């Protein structure tokens, strides 16, 4: 009996402290967020009140050790009257970034703020920055005021950041789109700003935000780690040029979940350096589908691995799930799963193209290619807008390897009949019911 008590005591003393110390940060944060302190803070944020009420008590009746500090952009001079509010936002950011503990930056609801190009830089002293966008942030309309044409709103080198609130970010893309060479081939091909870019941000969550009418791409994660992008609405017209919805570059451990993307380019694009990417619960269309690539442009080296796309619905897109690489590239795209996907009137539901070329002039034929391997298509069904629903255009010299299809059924939308497959230089394995089949 005593021996059992001793053993139990040793267990409690040894393991319980480590359990509490390793309790996930986001769970602790969820506990904080459920308290009365958060409810009151959140309620006052939306209406634009400053919140520094240290006397508030949580639901258990105990005063918190320290209340989060809140920095309202209006307090720093934002007017939301059609003039430039960039300086006020920057001042609010600098105050929050230089503070310790948990801090809020608040853009209240029922306000429409105009911003020129801004960069919110770290590193910051705060343990967590929560950027609450309740209102609407709109891009400055004069392109000549953009010193650097490729970015509008940038978060750079910021750890432990959350951007949320249910508000809108509008890129005013209608000013930029007519200047694109894809709209007017007589014009030079110049870049336009990405609406929101996160660069080298770790432990990042972007949620409950609507991004619309981006100048070019809507949302980019570049060289980030441990990212969650949740409950996003990304929209722009189907004919808006290069308006990718969510672009992932050089980023590891990212979850994109429960989001709707309707754009003029890829709904989600995943390019070199990205690893451990999961996209689930995605509704895509119009747009160019969910793409890995393009990879290997200009004979470059590219690597993408461990990608899972599941529980997606694609509606009227020009592609479904796509892997695209340029001739002449090097590297690999491997360990990729597309599963539990519904296609509705999609032009190329399943496609691998190692002969991708997005140029006016023809691309030269080259022997090297990015290796595509270990790709699984599972539980995919729906309709194709063209007779060919499955297309594998793989390299003669570096063919696609380890491509598997399981329980795939795609029919021709125009004929309501069995569709066709076009396959070249691919080593394919099929299981279960697969239609169409490569011949």
UniProtKB/Swiss-Prot annotation:
Feature: compositional bias, Basic residues: 44-62
Top EC class, one word: hydrolase
Gene3D superfamilies, per the entry: Single-stranded right-handed beta-helix, Pectin lyase-like (2.160.20.10)
Reaction it catalyzes: (1,4-alpha-D-galacturonosyl)n+m + H2O = (1,4-alpha-D-galacturonosyl)n + (1,4-alpha-D-galacturonosyl)m
Sorted UniProt keywords: Cell wall, Cell wall biogenesis/degradation, Glycosidase, Hydrolase, Repeat, Secreted, Signal
A GO cellular component annotation in the UniProt record: extracellular region
One GO process term, biological-process aspect: fruit dehiscence
EC number: 3.2.1.15
InterPro entries to which the protein is assigned, alphabetical: Glyco_hydro_28, PbH1, Pectin_lyas_fold, Pectin_lyase_fold/virulence
Residues at the catalytic site: 265, 288
Top-level division of the source organism's lineage: Eukaryota
Subcellular location: Secreted, Cell wall
Molecular function terms from GO: polygalacturonase activity
Annotated signal peptide: 1-21
Tissue and organ expression note: Expressed predominantly in roots with lower expression levels in rosette leaves, flower buds and siliques. Bearly detected in seeds. Found in flowers undergoing floral organ abscission. Also expressed early in anther development, at the time of microspore separation.
Pfam families registered for this protein in UniProt: Glyco_hydro_28 (PF00295)
Key word Cell inner membrane present: no
UniProt main location, coarse: secreted
Disulfide bonds: none
Disruption-associated phenotype: The mature pollen grains are arranged in a tetrad. No visible phenotype regarding floral organ abscission.
Record PANTHER family: PTHR31375
The family this protein is said to belong to: Belongs to the glycosyl hydrolase 28 family.
Protein name from the UniProt record: Polygalacturonase QRT2
Species per Swiss-Prot/TrEMBL record: Arabidopsis thaliana
Gene: QRT2
């Amino acid at each position: 009996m005593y021996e059992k008590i001793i053993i139990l005591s040793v267990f409690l003393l040894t393991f319980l402290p480590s359990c509490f110390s390793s309790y996930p940060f986001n769970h602790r944060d969820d506990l904080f967020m459920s308290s009365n302190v958060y409810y009151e803070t959140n309620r006052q944020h939306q209406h634009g009140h400053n919140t520094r009420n240290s006397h508030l008590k949580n639901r258990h009746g105990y005063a918190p050790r320290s209340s989060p500090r809140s920095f309202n952009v209006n307090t720093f001079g934002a007017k939301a009257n059609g003039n430039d509010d960039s300086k006020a936002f920057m001042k609010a950011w600098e105050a929050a970034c230089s503070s310790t503990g948990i801090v809020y930056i608040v853009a209240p609801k029922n306000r429409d703020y105009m911003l020129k190009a801004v960069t919110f830089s770290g590193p910051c002293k705060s343990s967590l920055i929560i950027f609450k966008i309740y209102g609407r942030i709109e891009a400055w309309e004069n392109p000549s005021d953009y010193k650097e044409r490729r970015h509008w709103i940038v978060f750079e080198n910021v750890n432990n950041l959350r951007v949320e609130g249910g508000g809108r970010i509008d890129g005013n893309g209608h000013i930029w789109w007519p200047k694109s060479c894809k709209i007017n081939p007589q014009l030079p091909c110049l870049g336009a700003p990405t609406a929101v870019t996160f660069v080298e941000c770790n432990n990042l969550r972007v949620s409950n935000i609507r991004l619309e009418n981006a100048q070019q791409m809507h949302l980019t994660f570049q060289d980030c780690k441990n990212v969650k992008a949740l409950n996003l609405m990304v929209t722009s017209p189907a004919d808006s040029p290069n308006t990718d919805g969510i672009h992932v570059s050089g980023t590891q451990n990212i979850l994109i979940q429960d989001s709707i993307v309707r754009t003029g380019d890829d709904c989600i694009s995943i390019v070199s350096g990205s690893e451990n990417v999961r996209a689930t619960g995605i509704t895509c269309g119009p747009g160019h589908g969910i793409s890995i690539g393009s990879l290997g442009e200009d004979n470059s080296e590219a690597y993408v691995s461990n990608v899972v796309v599941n529980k997606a619905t694609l509606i009227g897109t020009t592609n479904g799930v796509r892997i695209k690489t340029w001739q002449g590239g090097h590297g690999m795209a491997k360990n990729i799963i597309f599963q539990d996907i519904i296609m509705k009137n999609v032009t190329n539901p399943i496609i691998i193209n190692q002969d991708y070329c997005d140029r006016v002039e023809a691309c030269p034929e080259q022997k090297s290619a990015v290796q595509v391997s270990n790709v699984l298509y599972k539980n995919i069904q729906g309709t194709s807008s063209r007779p060919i629903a499955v297309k594998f255009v793989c390299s003669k010299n570096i063919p696609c390897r380890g491509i598997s299809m399981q329980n795939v059924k795609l029919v021709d939308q125009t004929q309501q009949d069995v569709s066709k497959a076009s396959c070249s230089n691919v080593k394919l394995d099929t299981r279960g019911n697969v239609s169409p089949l490569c011949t």
